Every structure is written in structure tokens, then in C-alpha cells.
Amino acid sequence: MTKASATFGFKDVDASAKAGLVRGVFDRVAKNYDLMNDVMSGGVHRLWKDAVAARLNPQPGEIIIDCAGGTGDMARRFAKMTRAAQERRGGPDALINIIDYNAEMIGAGIEKGGAPEITWTVGDAQRLPLPDAYADAYVISFGIRNVTDIDAALREARRVLKPGGRFLCLEFSKPVTEALSKAYDAYSFKLIPQFGEWLAKDRDAYQYLVESIRRFPDQKTFAGMMENAGFKRVTITNFTGGVAAMHQGWAL
């Protein structure tokens, strides 16, 4: 019987081994994770995240899952926005559930500080510890490419969303022009691992992260995977010429 395989950077590994390998990477980079995103995106990830938060437009009383949300970078944005809406017109507190497979990432996030609306749970995107039709929104930012079975994670996201709930994914993607693709490849493979060695003393972890971006499906392929998982009205918004993309779908 052939064992199931999964990608780990440019390597193909036994599917059963990938989660442990990825956990090892994030154990090592957790304390420098937000710096890592600055390096990998040239700091532009902050604008991309702001755009995702604006698209979500979270409201008081909503239940939001921030999957792979470890350091709380997105959740703090959502909490700030829901509090601002409360100040304008009242309403109950939102509940923002950060679920991350890596305890070190959650620890790094808690050290940075949270908010009353935010909870932190160690959990697997492929088997969420949540009931059906639980949340108003599910957001995953720079996390889904690290999941062993992306299709399973998408089905889980669909399962835990209420009817009318929304799925938003921010992920590094495929540049839309050949010139930009070549320039970003050169930056990624020549400079990012070197920055990882200089800033975090871990070239290999950054090398994996660069490779994992290249193995992730392109925008249209990922949109099709979302549709296969049951999402409707799937849309794609490219950022910085497709260096990153936001995918949105609805649980209808």
C-alpha cells in the first residue's frame, strides 16, 4: 500500500511526517515570526492584512475564527475594529478565537498582548475543536500552505461556518507577470534565507518558507479547491501584482 505524501518545501514527505516538520520550523521562528513576514514581504504584509481586515469589517457580537493566527497580528486588528464599532453604536463583545497548531506561536502572541475579545487555543486546522455552524467568519493568513491536507482544512472551515458565514484567506501566491515573478524569485531564494540566517540564525527555516510558497497552488487553482469544499461566490483579490492574494468565499 502506497503511503500518502505531502509537500514540505520542495521535498515530498510522508503525510504523517509533515505536521511535525512544520511544527519544528515554527518552534524555531516563533519569536521572530512577525519580523519574518516583514522580511518576506518587504513590510508590505501589514497593508495586505489591513485590506483583509477592512474586507471582513468585523462587527460587535460576531464570532471570528483566526486560524493559524499564532502571534495575534490579525486578531488584534479585528478586536480594535469591533471595539470601535461598539463605541459608535453599542452591541455585545465579539469573540475572536485564535486556533494555531503551534504552542510556541501562541506563546509568542500572548507575550505581545491580547484583548478581552481574544481567546487562544492549540488546535489543528484539519480537525477544529468546534461545533458545526459555529462562526460568522473564518480567516487564515499565511497559514494554509503549511497544512498537510489543504482540502481537509477547507472542508473544516466550511463545516464550522454558519449559513451566510465568510471565509477569507491571505496567502503568498503567484505574481501575475513574468518580470515580477523573476524578480520575486530572485529576492526570495537569494535574499530571504540569508536574512533568516542574519536575523534569526536559522537559514533552513526560511528556506522552507520560501519553498512552501512556490509549492502552493496558484490563485485559480486554490479558488477551485475552495469551490470543491463547498464555498460559493469565490473571489480573488491580488495584492502587489499577485505576490499575495486574498481569496473570499461564502458558506451559502
From Swiss-Prot:
Key words of the record: Menaquinone biosynthesis, Methyltransferase, S-adenosyl-L-methionine, Transferase, Ubiquinone biosynthesis
A family per Pfam: Ubie_methyltran
GO terms (BP aspect): aerobic respiration; menaquinone biosynthetic process; methylation
Binding locations of S-adenosyl-L-methionine: 71, 100, 124-125, 141
Pathway terms, separated by semicolons: Quinol/quinone metabolism; menaquinone biosynthesis; menaquinol from 1,4-dihydroxy-2-naphthoate: step 2/2; Cofactor biosynthesis; ubiquinone biosynthesis
CDD domains: AdoMet_MTases
A Gene Ontology molecular function term of the record: demethylmenaquinone methyltransferase activity
Catalyzed reactions: a 2-demethylmenaquinol + S-adenosyl-L-methionine = a menaquinol + S-adenosyl-L-homocysteine + H(+); a 2-methoxy-6-(all-trans-polyprenyl)benzene-1,4-diol + S-adenosyl-L-methionine = a 5-methoxy-2-methyl-3-(all-trans-polyprenyl)benzene-1,4-diol + S-adenosyl-L-homocysteine + H(+)
EC number: 2.1.1.163, 2.1.1.201
Similarity comment: Belongs to the class I-like SAM-binding methyltransferase superfamily. MenG/UbiE family.
Function text: Methyltransferase required for the conversion of demethylmenaquinol (DMKH2) to menaquinol (MKH2) and the conversion of 2-polyprenyl-6-methoxy-1,4-benzoquinol (DDMQH2) to 2-polyprenyl-3-methyl-6-methoxy-1,4-benzoquinol (DMQH2).
UniProt-listed HAMAP family: MenG_UbiE_methyltr (MF_01813)
Protein name in UniProt: Ubiquinone/menaquinone biosynthesis C-methyltransferase UbiE
Species this chain originates from: Caulobacter sp. (strain K31)
